[in-house]
Each structure stands twice: as structure tokens, then as C-alpha cells.
Amino acid sequence: MRAGTPRALAVAVLLEVDRGGRAQLLLDRALRRSPWPERDRAYATFLVYGALRRLRLLDHLLAPLLPRPEGLPPEVRWILRLGALEWLEGKPDHARVSPWVEEAKRRYPGLAGLVNAVLRRLAPREAPECVRLSLPDWLCEAWRGFFGDVAFAEGFNEPAPLFVTAYREVDLRPGPVPGSYLWEGPKTDFSALGLQPQNPASLFAAKLLEARPGERVLDLCGGAGLKAFYLAAQGAEVVSYDLNRRRQEAGARTARRLGLWVHYRTQDLTRPVPERAKKVLLDAPCTGTGTFRAHPELRYRLSPEDPARMAALQLQLLETAAQATEEGGVLVYSVCTLTEEEGEGVVRAFLARHPEFRPEPVQPPFPVLARGLGVYVDPRGGLDGFYYAKLRRVNSQA
């Protein structure tokens, strides 16, 4: 994917997102091939993420001016949305309209006049809250019913700060969790600096285990092992299980560069693991609604059935985690989503089946949306939305 300007690159990336691609991967790959100054790279990033985070609102603003938007070529629809995004951000007409008209001329010359007319006629328009937040109606209403309001979702439409977990001494601005820092420069070879990009809410899931030197810890659904890295840095003997061998191999390479040792084992975790431990972390696969800031396209790909479907899998995985937890041990369940079904719903169903487990208090060092058997993290301020539950096995009842 090659493009001559940040605007052209943004359109190209968004077209690939339309085809099912992931914005973060596509944009990172495109920027690696573009020898632009940081200002241009930052502007392309703003355009891609801004358009996806505000997509429903942008279409709402354009709707009175486009009676049949679905009849337009996808390139032109994205050009109009990106022009509307710049209008929404207060960019003046003289700096905003002409560049997008030129983009249209290069692709569809016959539609350049339409682009010019529409972008010059944009005007404020009241929008329902779910549209203003660019959330699907079904999820917006579910969150309103569960949390009481959806104001927290504005956090998903803010710029995403880059947090790193440090595995050596650094001179960076501290994040909200000890060991987490804010990275304010361009992306780089982080592991060479002893750093690992990781949201503080993700790091806190590993901290909940309170792993000590020499303790054996099982990291289930560990992926590349980001949480395992932190546990290993505490001196724990970490065994990280996942079904994706390729991600594990990439994680093992990163761990070596960070000077850490993690044992990786590849297995389907709907089946029991062949060992037990006093400390078990299950960071289960989920709908990912807490990561809408970093993965804004995800909100438009989920269906109302997805939370219940994922909850059924998560309950299966919790059964595996329970069998692997020794008496007196701790099982931490975490998901990077804010749905009732995948958080409180899963833990409630699990505890009904397993009276040998008791929930323990969880006190994150950042604001929470709701408390119950576990806690939901407020995604404002750069945090990912997470749910955590800390479960103690008080006896060996099966």
C-alpha cells in the first residue's frame, strides 16, 4: 500500500478496513513504508482512527446532503467522511475542502463537484447519544441498562496514548500502575529498550495474582505472553498456555530480548491442562468492547449475539482454570470487554457451579464503572475497558 499524501494513505487504509482488515496492523504497515516526517505520519493516524471512531456521527452529519450514499464508490464515501471529520475538528474550509476535492479528482473526476458541494454545506446537526458516540444501538442500550449511562464510552473516541511496561530503569512519565509508563515519542524497537507496549489495565490483571519469586504460575490463554512477561519479571516460574503457536513463538523471541524466561505450551484450553498451581490467570478471549479506542472498527463488526456466544466459551475455559487451581490458590479471571454477559454473568454462573471458590475484593488504582463479584474498569483517560474477578479456592470440592 503506497500513497503520496497522508490523506491518500488514510483512504487506502480505510478501504482495506472495509474489506475486513485491522486498522492498527494496516496503518502500521503502511507507515513503515512511508518515509514521511512525524507530522505527516501523525496526521494519517489521526484521519484513520478519527474516521473509524466517529463513523456513525460522520454519516449522520452527511446524511441530509447525500440521499443515496450507498450508491457512491467506497473511495468517495471515505473522502466525504474524512472531510466531515476535519470539519468536526474545526479545520477551516480553505484548508479542508480543496485537498479532498483533489483526492476525488484523482479517483472519480466526475464526482469532484459533489465532494466540493457537500463538504462546503456541512452544518451542525443534533444526534442521538448512541450515534454521537458512534456505538451500535444494541450495545449502547445494553450498556445504558447495565451501567446506568454510556458517558464513559466517550473515552473510546479520544486519542489513544501509548503505554509501555518497563523491564529496566527508565526516565519516562509514570502511568497509573507501578511499572507502567507513558511513551510520548515515535514508535521504536521497544524490546531493545527493555520496554513492552501494554495498556495499564492489561498489566493490572497480572498484578492481581501477587506472584512471588519461585512461585509457579499458570497463564491461560496467554497469547504472546504480555502478562506472563510481568509475572516472570517478579521471579515467578511462568507456564503460558495458548492455542496459537505462532503468537507464542513471537512472544518467546520478545521475552528473550527482554531478558525474561517464560515456558510456552500450545494447547486447546477447553481441555484440562496437565498441571496445577497456586496462582492461575485466565485472560479469556472476548468480544473486545473495552478496546474500541485502539481497535475502533471492531464496534461495527460485533453482533448482539456475540457476548452470549463468547460467554459460553469463557465458562468452558474457567472450568479448565478451576481444575488447574490448587486448594488455597487464587484464580484471576480477566477480559478486555465491558459486557455484562462476559463479566459478571460468567463469574455468577461459575460460582453457582463451584461453591469451593469465593470472590475476593479487587481494588484497581484507577476509576471503575461498576462493582459486583468483580470490577469493570472505566475506559476514560487512556485505559482499556477491562473486567477482573479474583477467586480464591477455599477447599478441594470438585
From Swiss-Prot:
It is found in: Cytoplasm. The keyword RNA-binding applies. One of its GO terms (cellular component) is cytoplasm. Specifically methylates the cytosine at position 967 (m5C967) of 16S rRNA. PROSITE patterns: SAM_MT_RSMB_NOP. Its EC number is 2.1.1.176. One of its GO terms (molecular function) is RNA methyltransferase activity. Keywords: Cytoplasm, Methyltransferase, RNA-binding, rRNA processing, S-adenosyl-L-methionine, Transferase. It catalyses: cytidine(967) in 16S rRNA + S-adenosyl-L-methionine = 5-methylcytidine(967) in 16S rRNA + S-adenosyl-L-homocysteine + H(+). The gene is rsmB. GO terms for biological process: regulation of DNA-templated transcription; RNA methylation; rRNA processing. The lineage of its organism: Bacteria, Thermotogati, Deinococcota, Deinococci, Thermales. It is an enzyme of class 2 (transferase). It comes from Thermus thermophilus (strain ATCC 27634 / DSM 579 / HB8). The active site is at residue 336. It holds the Pfam family NusB. S-adenosyl-L-methionine binds at residues 221-227, 242, 268, 283. Belongs to the class I-like SAM-binding methyltransferase superfamily. RsmB/NOP family. This is Ribosomal RNA small subunit methyltransferase B.
